Amino acid sequence: MTDATVLFAVREFPQSAGVAAEQLRKIRDELKTHGLEVRWASTADDAQAVLRTEAALAAAVVDWDLPHPATGGSDTGGAEVLRHVGRRFHNLPVFLATAGEDLEHLPLWVAETVIGYLWPLEDTAPFIAGRIAGAARGYQHNLLPPFFKALRRFDHAHEYSWHTPAHSGGVAFLKSPVGRAFHDYFGERLLRSDLSISVEELGSLFEHTGPVGAAERNAARVFGAERTYFVLHGDSTCDRMVGHFSVTRDEIALVDRNCHKSVLHGLVLSGARPVYLVPTRNGYGLAGPLPPAELQAQSVLSRTSRNPLTQGAVSPDAQYAVLTNSTYDGLCYDTLQVARALAPSTPRLHFDEAWFAYARFHPLYAGRYGMAVGPDTFPGPERPTVFSTQSTHKMLAALSQSAMVHINPAPRAPVEHERFNEAFMMHGTTSPLYPMIASLDVATAMMDGPHGRCLIDEAVTEAIRFRQAVVRIGRRIAAAGDRPEWFFGVWQPESVTDPATGQRLPFADAPAELLRTEASCWQLEPDANWHGFTGLTEGYCLLDPVKVTLTCPGIDAIGQMTDQGIPARVLTAYLATRNIVVEKTDSYTTLILFSMGITKGKWGTLMDALMDFKSLYDHNAPLERLLPELVAAHPHRYTGQTLRELCQEMHHHLRDARLVELLDTAFQDLPEPVTPPQHCYQRLIRGGTERVRLADAANRVAAAMVTVTPPGIPVLMPGENTGALDGPLLRYLTALESFDRRFPGFRSETHGVTLAPDTGDYLIECVRQIPAQQAARAAGEHLTAPTPNPLGPPLPPG
């Protein structure tokens, strides 16, 4: 047992005189011989601070009469500490130190929290320390989840390796200077846990047996699924896997246009024919949810019947639907509403929850995640099978690329394990990295029980504090009158309602307890100006508190632009010089994530940087001082320019080019589909495509996805027509091209676009034009008739 701690929450200080303190010191010394450190806390507040921050805690000794500051409550200090243990820990061994005559007067709930009682002066120090150490060892042993426990057990056996990988527990690295450097950096334990699937004791990832299978079953229980699969290549592989399993060639798939590119890859692999569903957008350019009306059966039928690709489908009914939940900017659906709306249109529903693996573990998100849809919440034969793909590493504690697929199957679309496992193995590897499996196992264990709720609650609480702090500082600046009144804002409700009293409160003044416990405070009320989305219904969508969007002056949520503006790209360029890297930057907004790793010091540093930026802007500081690397890289463009001048020039360009307006039009008016994505991919790999300048790209068929970041959503999918030169898509891309030329160093991140080496022109991949007779034949094959199935007629839908 190593790195374990025992809390002594007792009245006596470590240096106190008296026989009781002396006996406690003897017990402490005995515990050290068992490899246990003691943290001493002499007040309830100190003890609770240790409980919040000491992750190595393995046992606690709590004095019932521990003092605490007067709070007006009836609890003793010891009672407060015990309640805190119950809220935060599952089965932590707690010994209550009290006089024997006090037992009959203790509340009944105390016996449910403690595992025993101590009278320090009535037993010897070695005996008491042995009891505590034994309980701590048992707690640590039971704390470990199935796979991680088995991996540690195997490592402790120190067996010789006669199997892959060839580095043999890291030994091979020690035979080379550079290898030795690698070994020293990562350490022997990591390298010895990099094992082969030949180690039967650890089970099989492909067969889901042994400790691996036990870990997946445990994850299914914790995440609320009937079946869970561990995936070691990220949520992108999860998306491809589920899409490849759920829909086959020439079947119809309903696809949220606000989807990740991996969803498209699944369509390419399966040969499905996509029908896109269009989300709302607001004045900031942020993508909203799919409106409820978009999911209704009549609307889906209308989109399907108008889509040329469905003319050649094997059935007019969609076999699969996929939505992003939550969105990149933190918008979460009522998943039961979504499932009920889409149930008449598809038997399989996939929620891509890459950024939302924590949702089940906090009451704010109740009913907002895929696995909330099951036989208990949606009884009856209409319920669709639900898949949830989660990038565990993004917002929980797991190694990069560690992900999970959760499944709640329904009778109308059964998911037989043997069939799904074929897709799983097709997208998996026979050489898994065992530390990644262990990290998924540990991430699951961290979320299991009250500790998981506490971890997510801390992230929510810190996000709320930051949100309120930004607004309060803005108000103080406006009230001071000694400086320009502007400051950054936060995209969030301006006021909230306390359901207990009906009182309407400014968001910045609302009690943090209300904001972290009442989901209605975060719901997008229909047609509220602060969010700028239309067509929503009550309770349909919720803003995730931990995804914080900072807003810059220049535009509001309904798209009204002001004379003064600070484009967010300039802000994030400055933040980068302060070693602050944000998650996403749009024209006038920037996204930051409050994960479990966020601390007050971390967001306090961000707040200080925002204040410094304001001061530099107000004093018209030169760019050489703020962004020296930018000026050095482009001296002819930025030398002599000030921060305020750059912001204003960029703001005027965005306004005059109507970039935000063009963005909305490009995303709302979908290009016309011409051919399935799989056909374009086949042309791509056989040299049947070419890169085309925007000026020559009118009415061409795209061969690759074009995704603009910001906002990170596809504007053009493979198989779609680019439209006219003055159409919404090419006008928008041309405006981006113009922006990049005028503001070097602030280039848009546009996937699917390359730059001409001689001119810097945008180039997009298009299907090479073919003679008319070949075009007619291709159109006939891909629009009017399904691809021939060599295995016979297709299976019945559903």
Q: Language model features by range: what are they?
A:
Residues 19-25, 44, 56-89, 98-105:
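Conserved phosphotransfer microenvironments
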Residues 84-85, 338, 342, 610:
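Hydrophobic positions in alpha-helices of CheY-like receiver
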Residues 9-18, 42-44, 62-66, 97-100, ...:
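Structural motif
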Residues 2-31, 39-40, 60, 95, ...:
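Conserved acidic segment of CheY-like receiver
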Residues 41-44, 49-53, 67, 237-248, ...:
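Conserved PLP-enzyme active-site core in the AAT-like
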Residues 52-55, 102, 110-204, 221, ...:
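Non-catalytic terminal extensions of PLP-dependent enzymes
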Residues 189-237:
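Conserved N-terminal alpha-helix of the aminotransferase class I/II PLP-enzyme fold
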Residues 12-14, 96-103, 354-363:
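Short beta-alpha junction loops
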